[in-house]
Each structure stands twice: as C-alpha cells, then as structure tokens.
From Swiss-Prot:
Keywords: Cell membrane, Membrane, Transmembrane, Transmembrane helix
Name of the protein this chain belongs to: Probable [NiFe]-hydrogenase-type-3 Eha complex membrane subunit A
Annotated transmembrane regions: 11-31, 46-66, 68-88
Pfam short name (any one): NiFe_hyd_3_EhaA
Amino acid sequence: MVYNNSLLVRVMDIIILYLIALITSVIVALVLKLPIIPKEKPIRFSFETSIIFPTPILALGIEAIFRNLFGDYISLAFFAGLFGALLSKYADKLFGEP
C-alpha cells in the first residue's frame, strides 16, 4: 500500500497546532491561578472552571475554528490557547453563573 505523504504531513501539522493550543491554554490558566481540579464535591456535578475542564476543550475548539477560518498558523494556535484560558477564567463574568 502506498500512503500519500502529504496527508501524513497535514495530519502532523494539525496535531502540532492542537498541542500548541493545549499547552498554551494550560500555562495561561496556571498564570491566571485557575484551580487544577474543581474544589466542589462531587467533581462530576461541579460547574466550577478548572485547568482540566473546560480550559483545554475551549482552546481546542477555538483552534479548530481559527484553523478553518484563517489557515494553519502557529501564532493562531497560540492565540487560541490564550483565548481558551481567558474565556474559561472569565466565563462567569461574561455569561453569568449557572
């Protein structure tokens, strides 16, 4: 079987962009002093934001939107991680508490 080499390169580029967005969001969330895990018990019913959830999920979603709208750029992956962390930190102020 012959695999298309450009497809493999494309997939690796997307994985690298996702990793950049993920790592950036975790680092920015640590700088913003978000808790690593929610402090409310039980954790599965908690609406408290943390580094584990929803910060990386928001960053990956924003990265996917940026990639489809503007193309594959490392700087956009960095900004997606930054926006994901900021959105998870200030979501209660933007949208109100649940």
